[in-house]
Amino acid sequence: MIQMQSQLEVADNSGAKRVQCIKVLGGSKRRTAGVGDVIVVSIKEAQPRGKVKKGDVHRAVIVRTAKDVRRADGSVIRFDSNAAVLVNKNEEPIGTRIFGPVVRELRGRGYMKIISLAPEVL
């Protein structure tokens, strides 16, 4: 679960390394976000000459969480860290590559571009 002030790794080559959640989208009282949800993030650490720079505000889709993701068949999947992919207003990825595995639940949310760029879908 991701909430305001949560720090996440960036799993793409947009130039950002670390981001902080500043808003969970999807309702005025919504406090937490899980895999496949869109959040608003501030870039806290970035690579030089990247597409984004420190201090920028962007939207991001959560692709990995340390909190369990429960599947319909009863299985559970979790990761060591929280990670997100930066997206634009149309929810298309800013980067051209995705690093690390992503969860299958993104397919049901309509993020086929992220699924196709990912090296592994769990």
UniProtKB/Swiss-Prot annotation:
Biological-process GO terms, alphabetical: translation
Keyword Ribosomal protein attached: yes
Entries under InterPro entries matching the protein: Ribosomal_uL14, Ribosomal_uL14_bac-type, Ribosomal_uL14_CS, Ribosomal_uL14_sf
The keyword Cell division appears for this protein: no
Assembly information from the UniProt record: Part of the 50S ribosomal subunit. Forms a cluster with proteins L3 and L19. In the 70S ribosome, L14 and L19 interact and together make contacts with the 16S rRNA in bridges B5 and B8.
Protein task: Binds to 23S rRNA. Forms part of two intersubunit bridges in the 70S ribosome.
Name listed for the protein in its UniProt record: Large ribosomal subunit protein uL14
Species in which this protein is naturally found: Sphingopyxis alaskensis (strain DSM 13593 / LMG 18877 / RB2256) (Sphingomonas alaskensis)
Name of the gene: rplN
